Amino acid sequence: MATGRQFDLPFMVEQWDDTDSHVEELIALTGDYRVARAAFEEAVKRRPGRIVTLRQKTRLLADSRSLK
């Protein structure tokens, strides 16, 4: 049952399509930066060659393409 409570979950880990035009999968959504960073690092390992980003709302914090 919904309690009507709102959560602030600003950190997102997303996998993008090969043309970087849209999100294919929301991998993680959390309010904790350390959890988001760990999810990002694991997603990059499990999805070699794919575009994975870590964002805080609209701010880009990490991109798998910059790790090469």
Regions found by a protein language model. Give the residues of each.
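A short, charged, amphipathic alpha-helix used as a generic interaction element across diverse proteins
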Residues: 30-49
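Short, mixed-charge low-complexity intrinsically disordered segments
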Residues: 46-68
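Short, ordered coil/turn segments that flank beta-strands lining enzyme active or ligand-binding pockets
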Residues: 18-22, 34, 56
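Local beta-strand/beta-hairpin segments that build beta-sheet-rich folds
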Residues: 24-28, 61-63
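Short linear motifs at secondary-structure transitions and domain/linker junctions
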Residues: 2-5, 26-31, 38
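Short aromatic-glycine-(Arg/Gly/Cys) micro-motifs in beta-strand/loop hairpins
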Residues: 1-24
